[in-house]
């Protein structure tokens, strides 16, 4: 371990120790106070990363089990800390990662991309919309926007940029600068449009459910995000194109698409089966209530079906590093969060807010302030998941005691987590991957990100709120 990592480790170990030696605040049990210290240390660990996320959470889980065993007086078993690993939410994420990996291993993701390039990629603006349609098609089945944007969309679009004579060092503004920003800004929009488009969505909804006791189905989420999301997908490539127009306008898309499809060859049986399974997965998630199952059940059935049909092999599942990493840290953070809820930490936090913050009955003002703050603080987080575990419970409790409309605030918070990450090139793991290709500078990236973030915010608090109220009135949320 190097010196820098050692200091990071000392910091996250010091946090629960310091909090543990301090007396618990009035109204909060000693168990809840010490568990909060461990949870806070886990959050800091996710941000500064002395170890990979799974290691940080395993340490936090181990410490929490020791604390529960010694301070709970039998009220809770140590296995309560492990509840996140038995949560359907955790397995939904893992199963969706397997579906996502199948698009790469079968080549179906590439085939869809080249078909789109051949149809609408005859201009550089059209290529921007290729990123829109490709990401939108893949989003429901890809709970990692890093895998989606960085693993599927980026390699294809980058090869197109190179083919058009755009190089990071010599000619970034020819087309690469525009296309790279399009990939990132688009994926930050599609990531909030579907419950399963980003792992953080599933974690965020679980927290909203624990704190505000609101239920939102896969279909309800997609309907709520659909109108503002589609509007932003339509304008995003155009806004980037207007602010930083590429030097070339026309593209020989037919040649590029033909070469790409020729390399892939005829559509294979695995691709056809995957396409069928993908459609069935979407139908299952949309009509899960009518079918009498939940979203997690659909995801696990899909994974089992892909293994049964040979679309993916068990070796493919084992090699899916992103899925296993997420399973470990995700299950850990859900378990810790659920335990904090059980020991009434969030109830205590609500009372603190209620006694110290007042909007004097102006619930709509509270709604505006909470959502605006949720975007501003994203400047300080390089991880959407770290933001969720650190700030979402705070904003949710603030909404609960301020008189803000709860369903509207919940939806706005669930969506702002993703688009708030537009503001910087480190606002999500996909950012460093795309920015690292070398076509973009920080100034232009941050400027475009700020403009699109503000525009998205305005769309959500105007047309979005109107649309959500309509859905609530129709009993569709």
Curated annotation (Swiss-Prot):
<feature type="transmembrane region" description="Helical">
    <location>
        <begin position="6"/>
        <end position="26"/>
    </location>
</feature>
<dbReference type="Pfam" id="PF00939">
    <property type="entry name" value="Na_sulph_symp"/>
</dbReference>
<dbReference type="GO" id="GO:0022857">
    <property type="term" value="F:transmembrane transporter activity"/>
</dbReference>
<dbReference type="GO" id="GO:0005886">
    <property type="term" value="C:plasma membrane"/>
</dbReference>
<feature type="topological domain" description="Cytoplasmic">
    <location>
        <begin position="1"/>
        <end position="5"/>
    </location>
</feature>
<keyword id="KW-1133">Transmembrane helix</keyword>
<feature type="topological domain" description="Cytoplasmic">
    <location>
        <begin position="109"/>
        <end position="148"/>
    </location>
</feature>
<keyword id="KW-0997">Cell inner membrane</keyword>
<feature type="topological domain" description="Cytoplasmic">
    <location>
        <begin position="400"/>
        <end position="445"/>
    </location>
</feature>
<dbReference type="InterPro" id="IPR030676">
    <property type="entry name" value="CitT-rel"/>
</dbReference>
<feature type="topological domain" description="Periplasmic">
    <location>
        <begin position="294"/>
        <end position="297"/>
    </location>
</feature>
<feature type="transmembrane region" description="Helical">
    <location>
        <begin position="51"/>
        <end position="71"/>
    </location>
</feature>
<feature type="transmembrane region" description="Helical">
    <location>
        <begin position="149"/>
        <end position="169"/>
    </location>
</feature>
<feature type="topological domain" description="Periplasmic">
    <location>
        <position position="378"/>
    </location>
</feature>
<feature type="topological domain" description="Periplasmic">
    <location>
        <begin position="467"/>
        <end position="477"/>
    </location>
</feature>
<feature type="topological domain" description="Periplasmic">
    <location>
        <begin position="170"/>
        <end position="219"/>
    </location>
</feature>
<keyword id="KW-0472">Membrane</keyword>
<feature type="transmembrane region" description="Helical">
    <location>
        <begin position="379"/>
        <end position="399"/>
    </location>
</feature>
<keyword id="KW-0812">Transmembrane</keyword>
<feature type="topological domain" description="Cytoplasmic">
    <location>
        <begin position="49"/>
        <end position="50"/>
    </location>
</feature>
<feature type="transmembrane region" description="Helical">
    <location>
        <begin position="357"/>
        <end position="377"/>
    </location>
</feature>
<comment type="similarity">
    <text>Belongs to the SLC13A/DASS transporter (TC 2.A.47) family. DIT1 subfamily.</text>
</comment>
<feature type="transmembrane region" description="Helical">
    <location>
        <begin position="298"/>
        <end position="318"/>
    </location>
</feature>
<feature type="topological domain" description="Cytoplasmic">
    <location>
        <begin position="319"/>
        <end position="356"/>
    </location>
</feature>
<feature type="transmembrane region" description="Helical">
    <location>
        <begin position="220"/>
        <end position="240"/>
    </location>
</feature>
<feature type="topological domain" description="Periplasmic">
    <location>
        <position position="27"/>
    </location>
</feature>
<keyword id="KW-0813">Transport</keyword>
<feature type="topological domain" description="Cytoplasmic">
    <location>
        <begin position="241"/>
        <end position="272"/>
    </location>
</feature>
<feature type="transmembrane region" description="Helical">
    <location>
        <begin position="88"/>
        <end position="108"/>
    </location>
</feature>
<feature type="transmembrane region" description="Helical">
    <location>
        <begin position="28"/>
        <end position="48"/>
    </location>
</feature>
<dbReference type="InterPro" id="IPR001898">
    <property type="entry name" value="SLC13A/DASS"/>
</dbReference>
<feature type="topological domain" description="Periplasmic">
    <location>
        <begin position="72"/>
        <end position="87"/>
    </location>
</feature>
<feature type="transmembrane region" description="Helical">
    <location>
        <begin position="446"/>
        <end position="466"/>
    </location>
</feature>
<feature type="transmembrane region" description="Helical">
    <location>
        <begin position="273"/>
        <end position="293"/>
    </location>
</feature>
<protein>
    <recommendedName>
        <fullName>Inner membrane protein YbhI</fullName>
    </recommendedName>
</protein>
<keyword id="KW-1003">Cell membrane</keyword>
């Amino acid at each position: 371990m190097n010196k820098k990592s050692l200091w990071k480790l000392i910091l996250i170990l010091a946090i629960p120790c310091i909090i543990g030696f301090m007396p618990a605040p009035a109204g909060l049990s000693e168990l809840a106070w010490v568990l909060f210290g461990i949870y806070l240390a886990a959050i800091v660990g996710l941000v500064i990363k002395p170890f990979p996320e799974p290691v940080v959470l395993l340490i936090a889980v181990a410490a929490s089990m020791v604390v529960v065993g010694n301070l709970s007086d039998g009220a809770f078993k140590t296995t309560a800390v492990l509840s996140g690993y038995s949560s359907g939410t955790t397995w939904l994420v893992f199963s969706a990662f397997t579906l996502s990996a199948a698009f790469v291993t079968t080549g179906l993701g590439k085939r869809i991309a080249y078909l789109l390039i051949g149809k609408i990629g005859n201009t550089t603006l059209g290529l921007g919309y290729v990123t829109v349609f490709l990401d939108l098609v893949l989003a429901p089945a890809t709970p990692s926007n890093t895998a989606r944007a960085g693993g599927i969309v980026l390699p294809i679009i980058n090869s197109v940029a190179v083919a058009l004579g755009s190089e990071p060092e010599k000619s970034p503004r020819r087309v690469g600068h525009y296309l790279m920003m399009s990939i990132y800004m688009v994926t930050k929009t599609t990531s909030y449009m579907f419950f399963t488009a980003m792992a953080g969505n599933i974690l965020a909804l679980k927290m909203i459910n624990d704190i505000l006791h609101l239920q939102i189905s896969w279909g309800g989420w997609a309907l709520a995000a659909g109108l503002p999301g589609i509007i932003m997908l339509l304008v995003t490539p155009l806004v980037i194109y207007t602010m930083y127009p590429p030097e070339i306008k026309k593209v020989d898309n037919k040649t590029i698409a033909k070469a790409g499809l020729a390399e892939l060859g005829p559509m294979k049986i695995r691709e056809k089966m995957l396409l069928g399974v993908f459609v069935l997965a979407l139908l299952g998630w949309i009509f899960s209530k009518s079918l009498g199952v939940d979203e997690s059940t659909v995801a696990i059935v899909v994974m089992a079906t892909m293994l049964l049909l040979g679309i993916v092999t068990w070796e493919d599942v084992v090699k899916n590093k992103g899925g296993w990493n997420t399973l470990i840290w995700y299950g850990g953070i859900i378990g810790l969060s659920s335990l904090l809820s059980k020991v009434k930490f969030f109830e205590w936090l609500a009372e603190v807010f209620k006694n110290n913050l007042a909007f004097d009955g102006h619930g709509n003002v509270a709604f505006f302030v909470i959502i605006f703050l949720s975007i501003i603080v994203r400047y300080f987080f390089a991880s959407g998941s770290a933001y969720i575990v650190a700030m979402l419970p705070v904003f949710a409790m603030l909404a609960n005691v301020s008189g803000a409309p709860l369903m509207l605030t919940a939806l706005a918070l669930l969506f702002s987590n993703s688009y708030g990450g537009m503001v910087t090139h480190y606002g999500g793991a996909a950012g460093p991957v795309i920015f690292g290709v070398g076509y973009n500078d920080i100034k232009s990236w941050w400027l475009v990100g700020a403009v699109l973030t503000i525009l998205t915010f305005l769309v959500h608090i105007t047309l979005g709120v109107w649309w959500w109220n309509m859905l609530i009135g129709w009993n569709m949320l």
